[in-house]
Amino acid sequence: MKNIKKPFDLKGKSLLKEYDLTGEEFEGLIDFAMTLKKYKQQGTPHRYLEGKNIALLFEKTSTRTRAAFTVASIDLGAHPEFLGKNDIQLGKKESVEDTAKVLGRMFDGIEFRGFSQKTVEQLAEFSGVPVWNGLTDDWHPTQMLADYMTIKENFGYLKGINLTYVGNGRNNVAHSLMVAGAMLGVNVRICTPSSLTPRDVYFNIAKDQASNYGGSVKITDNIHTAVKDADVIYTDVWVSMGEESEFETRIHLLKDYQVNRKMLNLTGKVDTIFLHCLPAFHDTQTEYGQDIFKKYGLTEMEVTDEIFRSEHSRVFDQAENRMHTIKAVMAATLG
């Protein structure tokens, strides 16, 4: 097994939101993940967490986050233990504080995917072990590591990249893209209707990070100016988990913000890549997709099937990179 080369001394540190790290630390984790990806491809052992036990707490369902944390843990030599919403009592029969103190006695690290940012913050405060945010309503830092790793793999650099996010500007992905991009020197544009712009608290954090690291953040409802010269176009579902009652309203607001061939052409570039954190409503091959078609007559929502499957799309590289970047976070903070 090769000796571990950590980007920075992050041992014992939690990752609850992007700006828990410096920009240099954040990109260092991306570079570390790229090294671990090579180890995986080469079959080089990298069991840096041999004998460690990892708790995977899930209030929300998951495909990529659960799979990524599970495989990453096993590859690193650790044992992952899944605790779903029916297994844990967070704030119901037992306080988050008490739960955290118990889990901290038994596990070496804790992942949490759920609703409240306060919950993951309390887990970190009271457990005494590193805690990693697998998604909350406010932030999605492990997704950002994978997203910006995918961009760096494609272009070779991050500083100066033009990234345009199109769609609902009031979700965790939009918040995190702004802040992480600003920390990495990326020019981030959030293209969204005026009624869905990011709240000031998140925008102001992003602006502060941009002033520190040389990135930029802009918000607009003008699709033409937002996507011009974009190296990356990113979108997400129009309705997040728990917002299903908003479908009709969001379709009305966001139908013109669909990522399609016309939008890609507006970039003026031939090498623009398309990203999506998944799952995506790009066809009718799911129960949701069929239901949306029956109710609204739509066969595609935030992205057309053509673009999703096109040479521009990097969505499955992006999904794979969840595992490599999560592995980097765990190894750097526990190894």
UniProtKB/Swiss-Prot annotation:
It is found in: Cytoplasm. Keywords: Arginine metabolism, Cytoplasm, Transferase. GO terms for cellular component: cytoplasm. Gene3D superfamilies: Aspartate/ornithine carbamoyltransferase. Its main location: cytoplasm. It holds the Pfam family OTCace_N. One of its GO terms (molecular function) is amino acid binding. It comes from the Bacteria. It is an enzyme of class 2 (transferase). InterPro entries: Asp/Orn_carbamoyltranf_P-bd, Asp/Orn_carbamoylTrfase, Asp/Orn_carbamoylTrfase_sf, Asp_carbamoyltransf_Asp/Orn-bd, Orn/put_carbamltrans, OTCase_ArgI. Transmembrane segments: none annotated. It catalyses: carbamoyl phosphate + L-ornithine = L-citrulline + phosphate + H(+). Carbamoyl phosphate binds at S62, T63, R64, T65, Q89, R113, H140, P141, T142, Q143, C277, L278, R322. Pathway: Amino-acid degradation; L-arginine degradation via ADI pathway; carbamoyl phosphate from L-arginine: step 2/2. GO terms for biological process: arginine biosynthetic process via ornithine; arginine catabolic process to ornithine; citrulline biosynthetic process; L-arginine biosynthetic process. L-ornithine binds at N172, D236, S240, M241. Its EC number is 2.1.3.3. Reversibly catalyzes the transfer of the carbamoyl group from carbamoyl phosphate (CP) to the N(epsilon) atom of ornithine (ORN) to produce L-citrulline. NCBIfam families: orni_carb_tr (TIGR00658), PRK00779.1 (NF001986). Belongs to the aspartate/ornithine carbamoyltransferase superfamily. OTCase family. This is Ornithine carbamoyltransferase 2, catabolic. It comes from Staphylococcus epidermidis (strain ATCC 12228 / FDA PCI 1200). The lineage of its organism: Bacteria, Bacillati, Bacillota, Bacilli, Bacillales.
